[in-house]
Amino acid sequence: MARKVLVMGEVRDGSLRNVSFEAVAAAKTIAEGGEVVGLLLGESVASFAKELIHYGADRVVTVESDKLSSYTSDGYAQAFLVVYEEEKPEGIVFGHTALGKDLSPKLAAKLNAGLVSDVTALEVAGGNVVFTRPIYSGKAFEKKIVTDGVLFATIRPNNIAPLEKDEAREGDVSSMTVDVKDLRTVIKEVVRKTAEGVDLSEAKVIIAGGRGVKSEEGFKPLKELADVLGGAVGASRGACDAEYCDYSLQIGQTGKVVTPDLYIACGISGAIQHLAGMSNSKIIVAINKDPEANIFKVADYGIVGDLFEVLPLLTEEFKKLKVHS
């Protein structure tokens, strides 16, 4: 059954987030040969439309307004619903991001649509789109179908591979005007944090800690190195269970799946559940006192040593490189 599917693209720090392309790929599956329409909301987003098309969208609709320069649920909901009424899609796809998790339930309620959140895989079987998502804190997975109304899903980042980019691919780009008003929230200032504020799913560099960090205080040298490298801090399930850090930092089968350019694993043994969340990193560096630790089997570079001795040395060397670069 061919469907029209509307995909929310997300722009952050002057570029489209990778999850936007993953959402387009998911939408292609849901569409079953139907049309995939990208949607971009913001103050100046039209320049990103072609990139969505290069990754598989058939056409893109943009809504630009200074009132959409920063995300608010009221403003984005107003703009989205105007586009929805014009397009009448049978499917909607968001990334399972802070924006997607906040906005999609509100829209699903307004549209009386069944929302399947945190989707890690999807397929078409027996005429239905079958969504796979984790349950019970990732201890199990369930498969769900939506039998009536609009198919509405949020896609967990780094789980569904984007389509290959085709810069020769063409599609129509149109704009709509929406009178965004009655906003209950006004963004006065955006304050950028250091390592803790970097989105793990988008980070190019991740410094991750396991039980070997020994305490909440033990994460301090990881954060210092992450700040120097402009990266994010992550953690294994073991470190989270031990209450060394928040579960929002968890990487692995039951946490976030990441694919950074550089992944430095500190005091992480390398349980298969953790490897499932980071083994596709471009370069993996392991630091562990145990030379037999499983993490070394997937590492490109290994350092057998005490992370509390190694990390300060790495931090100082990277600081020197930054000064001379």
Positions of predicted regions on the chain:
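N-terminal glycine-rich FAD/FM-binding segment characteristic of electron-transfer flavoproteins
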Residues: 1-325
